[in-house]
């Protein structure tokens, strides 16, 4: 199979689903249906077949790459006459709102933990590095939430640099999708994992395309392997609207929810509001900031209907 996109054709090896699935080799399935149920996101229908066909081959590839990096590190440590370093392998997962980045990240974390070479796999989302809600309001960025300028990039880069340098304990802020804000006084501690998975909208950006301060390093400078989860925009908008309706029945019904005022909407009213949010915020962010970084990824997972992967593109 070859990509229709000439840039992708030049940069990537392209696999149809069936071609990719055979690359699983003999990797055993380590997740049960209950495990998968716990990993699924809102409005996603990931099956064990999807894990077998797409994620097991990917976990095998990543295991081989991480092992090679570890072996190279041992050689370098021996050459330099130093103790083995504790620098983790960093995998980033990028893509649009509603594409399923979080589910992809959780499944990969669960699978990679079962390889004996790297049992400690941590997952951090960049949501926690969004400026606090009060700061976004003060800066006039509330309608730009998710855009690069809405993140505390200095804090994010300092976090990832500390993890990469092998610092014993590094704290990351935690985000609540209920309050639409950082959780004050709470944090996630990352303690020298073998692998760190970093999931977020803008983790593939560089100084070439970001409106924030370009004089300091970007997250992408610290990443060893990057994944972009891709889908056509009409599907992304559809999934966002479906997810919005699910949230209206679930998280929005919580009186503490920032979006509690949406809980009483009819389906038609909710669809109109979700479409407007997509057209004014998520869609423009995808077109301006997220999709242009796609071809920087080492691997692209292309989704079709029902969140099913249709193609995999692997950097040559």
Swiss-Prot record:
Give the molecular function GO annotations.
Answer: ATP binding; pantothenate kinase activity
Task: Show the Gene3D superfamilies listed in the entry.
Answer: P-loop containing nucleotide triphosphate hydrolases
CDD domains in alphabetical order? PanK (cd02025)
Q: What class of enzyme is it?
A: transferase
Note whether ATP-binding occurs among the keywords. yes
Q: What is its main location?
A: cytoplasm
Q: Which reaction does it catalyse?
A: (R)-pantothenate + ATP = (R)-4'-phosphopantothenate + ADP + H(+)
One Gene Ontology CC term in the entry: cytoplasm
Q: Which SUPFAM superfamilies match?
A: P-loop containing nucleoside triphosphate hydrolases
Under which EC number(s) is this enzyme classified? 2.7.1.33
Q: Does the keyword Mitochondrion apply?
A: no
Q: In which pathway does it act?
A: Cofactor biosynthesis; coenzyme A biosynthesis; CoA from (R)-pantothenate: step 1/5
User: Where does it localize?
Assistant: Cytoplasm
- Example GO biological process: coenzyme A biosynthetic process
Listed binding positions for ATP are 95-102
For this chain, the family text in UniProt reads: Belongs to the prokaryotic pantothenate kinase family.
Q: Which NCBIfam families match?
A: panK_bact
Name the record gives this protein? Pantothenate kinase
Native source organism of the sequence: Shewanella sp. (strain MR-7)
Q: Which gene encodes it?
A: coaA
